[in-house]
């Protein structure tokens, strides 16, 4: 069987071949591809990724056949018609039995269906842009957003409001895609409900994700963690909820003044020139000063897979404070390692975290409850260890490589038989 994947990221293996830095967090999709190939010896896999180049590039020297397709979009033009022509060439060259589109967020997913039709085509849900757009500002009012406009925002016409509008445009393409295909793969009751609301007759297939390899190899230990430390996997735009942690920190610090927050990603507000600072950076910087907590935050830069594991293991608690998520890999990774988790009760997180059993939940806007949850884990090592043990059990089942690979092969066979 020949399977052609469309991916939003360039696989790390190909990045190394062409001299690019591997994408942060992109290793999970390559891990899934490798598990698929190793479990099914007669399967041939091709992967299409997209880049800002000028020509179609093909790499056939690996176990996976890679295609790099030029794609040029802007905030004003979110769909590149030329991509359809390139994808026709790719499909003619590879001749897939099944096309598996990973993600609905970008125009190239729709381009595949427009170019080659929806027969024997499956779309996997990652995030859902058409719904995420409603939460992009993370509860910050438009008035507050507009008051924090920066020189960069004005010159580049790239404020948080315009970013939200850009997401809405991509959401329109996403809806068109979902209405054009017959098979969807999802993994939460939230994504199931969202897809059902758009196209109720579509065939929904359930399948969990396989995570990056390193996260299966280590185990969090209370005795080895850094006490009163919080880890966040990202925070550079408002949907991810960094500002909620800033608001909670004075309450946490009242009981635990030595609390520190470690954030994967670059410092985007105090270590860059003013002319590169965006509105959210302005908002975050001011909020930190108002709460006198800027000294408690440590931005770690772009972290490799191994460094991410290291930070999860060091943390006393991991928090996912997002305004919306489907099934964030960061929560899955933390649970697989056993790092005690706190997460906002949004989107598909309800299917990943059972309150007081495999993590602690709070409503996104409930800052006192978030702060209290952190203090509970800091003060109660028995609770922390209970959560850790339970998380590892449920995550090991959810992210089991063999189970998930077998399930995806079942779906491929079912679709191919039509």
Question: What residues fall within each predicted segment?
Answer:
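Membrane-proximal helix-turn-helix segments that form the acceptor-binding/catalytic region
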Residues: 145-183, 193, 197
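Aromatic "clamp/platform" in nucleotide-sugar-dependent glycosyltransferases that forms part
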Residues: 323
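Nucleotide-activated donor-binding/catalytic signature segment of Leloir-type glycosyltransferases, i.e.
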Residues: 275-302
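Conserved acidic donor-binding segment of nucleotide-sugar-dependent glycosyltransferases
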Residues: 355-356, 360-367, 376-381
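N-terminal subdomain of nucleotide-sugar transferases
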Residues: 1-54, 60-67
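Short alpha-helical donor nucleotide-sugar binding micro-motif in glycosyltransferases
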Residues: 91, 302, 310-315
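Short hydrophobic beta-strand element within catalytic cores of glycosyltransferases
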Residues: 340-343
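Conserved donor-binding/catalytic core segment of Leloir-type glycosyltransferases
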Residues: 4, 221-240, 246-251, 261-264
